[in-house]
Amino acid sequence: MQHDDRLIVALDFPTLEQAKACVVELGDAVSYYKVGMELYYAVGSEIIRFLKEQGKHVFLDLKLQDIPNTVAHALTVLSDLGADMMNVHAVGGKKMMAEAVKAVHEAAEAAGRPAPKLIAVTILTSMDNEQFADLNYKNTIA
């Protein structure tokens, strides 16, 4: 079965064993997996190593947000683990996002590999207009 890189399967499991079982069951049908906070915080980089050993792509969905220097250093470490795509939370600001981009590109260049994709989350999909208004933004969710 041929896989489609546009499909990213979320490994929203609390244990490494459950995540591995899902990857094994899906086999060659899926090549891209999302590792979120629950799994990454539970098992750390072991899940990334496993996925890379299986020849899979990794979207590390941690929505990093902190001072620019902290995010840049964290992304350098995560880039070196082999994540193919990562994200930051845009509310961290332009400077944080610019430092994030610079960090992943510098880490990739130093390691002689392509830079991972870096995307910014602007708003969580779970928010409604009432929750959005609580943040004191002037607009509504469109």
Q: Which residues make up each language-model segment?
A:
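N-terminal amphipathic alpha-helix/helix-capping segment at the start of soluble metabolic enzymes
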Residues: 1-21, 109-115
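Conserved anion-binding
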Residues: 3-4, 70-142
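Hydrophobic faces of well-ordered beta-strands that scaffold small-molecule active sites
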Residues: 5-11, 33-35, 58-62, 86-88, ...
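N-terminal beta-alpha supersecondary unit
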Residues: 29-42
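Active-site cofactor/substrate anionic-group-binding motifs, chiefly glycine-
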Residues: 34-37, 48-67
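Active-site beta->alpha loop and helix N-cap motifs at the rims of alpha/beta catalytic domains
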Residues: 41-42, 67-70
